[in-house]
Amino acid sequence: MAKAAVTKRHHFMIQKLLILLSYGYTNGLDDAHSLRCNLTIKDPTPADPLWYEAKCLVDEILILHLSNINKTMTSGDPGETANATEVGECLTQPLKDLCQKLRNKVSNTKVDTHKTNGYPHLQVTMIYLQSQGQIPSATWEFNISDSYFFTFYTENMSWRSANDESGVIMNKWKDDGEFVKRLKFLIPECRQEVDEFLKQPKEKPRSTSRSPSITQLTSTSPLPPPSHSTSKKGFISVGLIFISLLFAFAFAM
């Protein structure tokens, strides 16, 4: 049992390192841009009626904060507000519909209540990368109560689970054609607005804090901003992440 838990954590660590590797590479490219949406689905209570929350960031700039209680759209630069609003408005309804669908799926998913401690808590991270010469694609990461993990790649419509237990849930979810369609077409429905905003030059915020841990990737805090000096720093970070990835694989053996 303990070995299985450790193996599960290793799989999750490797999965996060792969995402970090992707960001480390694209952050080293001057023309690389990204849209990231963090979704949270949880059980509401009388004291806290919040059951879903969505935050979307473009190149670390928060453009949309949406929940079943309120909605806020913002941009880091007044000159970008109009375009950020267009992106936020386009994403709002699809995200609302998706969160409702996710809530239904979590409610109907059988999980080990000892692992989930009651109603499952779902975290979903969508990452859309855009870089010249590369095909734009989105990656969806699913984390159910820090116990079940799986990923969907829209580029080749493939799924990957962290372990067998996660695979059981993943296979049921991927057989839902309507659900998969929502994941696949969320970005294409707003592709024009998103791409236009991503193409705009932006003054990205500088970070004075240390790099986030792997577990912070699924939180609502922004990712570390790219370097503006040279692409060399980006490739150095890739090398460090790659070394960490090798260690993770070694421990998982």
Swiss-Prot record:
Glycosylated. A lipid is attached at S229 (GPI-anchor amidated serine). Expressed predominantly in embryonic brain. Glycans are attached at N38, N70, N83, N143, N156. InterPro entries: MHC_class-I_related (IPR050208), MHC_I-like_Ag-recog_sf (IPR037055), MHC_I/II-like_Ag-recog (IPR011162), RAE-1 (IPR029287). The keyword Isomerase does not apply. It is a lipid-anchor; GPI-anchor. Residues 197-206 have a biased composition (Basic and acidic residues). Pfam families: MHC_I_2. The keyword Cell membrane applies. Keywords: Cell membrane, Disulfide bond, Glycoprotein, GPI-anchor, Lipoprotein, Membrane, Signal. One of its GO terms (biological process) is cellular response to lipopolysaccharide. Coiled coil: none annotated. Induction: By retinoic acid. GO terms for cellular component: plasma membrane; side of membrane. Residues 211-221 have a biased composition (Low complexity). It is found in: Cell membrane. Residues 197-230 are annotated as: Disordered. Acts as a ligand for KLRK1. This is Retinoic acid early-inducible protein 1-alpha. It comes from Mus musculus (Mouse).
